[in-house]
Amino acid sequence: MNAIHAKTRPYRVGMIVPSSNTTMETEIPALLQRQSAVDGSRFTFHSTRLRLRHVAPEALQAMNDAAGDAVDALCDSQVDTVMYACLLATMFGGKASVVETGQRLARRANYMRAAPVSVVTSADALIAALHSLGAQSISMIAPYRKELTARVTATIEEHGIVVRQAVSLEIADDVAVGRLDQQTLLSMACELDLANSDALVLSAGVQMPSIEVLDAVEQLLGLPVLSAASASVWALLQKLRIEPQVKAAGWLLRSSCAHANAHAHAHAHAHEERQAA
């Protein structure tokens, strides 16, 4: 895929975020700025917030119910894409909720619009990203209470991906999640037994910051490492038909050229080992 370089204005990215979220409006622009530094694509960011103070089932359902009106508000500014940045609100209801929410918001975004608007949900994005990596089994770290993490686990497994390990940080206060030290995630990841995992979801929550350590964790562990934020950016770039070229954000967002170089390096290393043997 190549960027549509003939575009004369920046891509307008609309974001729907929980009212207590302090992370996605930081991490999504940061990742896309790295994309811009490589290919010159330009983005502007426009957000609306839905009330969520504590992560609880009734609050998550209320968010989902209000998401359609939030889409309308964003589309008034003629955005090119809408990102619904609340993974748990969508995954809480299982696979059916993931599918229904994505379809419902896409219909709302494109009802009587002059130009098509693509819709990305963080839940759909994470599932699609894992499938693109060929991950059949994963481990993940989530900020939620165990019963909520179990819902996310069940939804991922409904999509045909086995969750080998799911670490719950047991934090109910969403603002507190946004203050977590990313270096803590690095330490936690290194303590996991990943022998039977094809990938690690370092942050299975849009509020838990992680992008500054994604690459470091991936290099230490030797398997793909992603987050709700990196998966959301990957899906957004797919919708806009832009090849991901985001540096220092893990395998998922590297360019096809970087992938080819990595494969060539691995092949050469294996050849050297055979020669030495």
Question: For the regions a protein language model found, what residue spans apply to each?
Answer:
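Hydrophobic structural segments
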Residues: Y11, S41, S118-A135, A189, ...
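Active-site/ligand-binding-proximal alpha/beta "capping" segment
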Residues: E191-A195, L200-V201, M208-P224
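Periplasmic-binding protein-like
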Residues: G14-I16, V79-A85, S139-M140, S197-G205
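N-terminal glycine-rich anion-binding loop in soluble enzyme alpha/beta folds
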Residues: M1-D69, Y144-D181
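A short, acidic, amphipathic alpha-helical segment used as a generic capping/interface helix at domain edges
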Residues: G68-D72, D181-D193, P209-L214
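Conserved beta-alpha
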Residues: T101-A172
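C-terminal functional extensions of proteins
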Residues: S227-A260, E272-A277
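Glycine/small-residue-rich loop that forms an oxyanion/phosphate-binding "nest" at active or ligand-binding sites
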Residues: A67, V71-V119
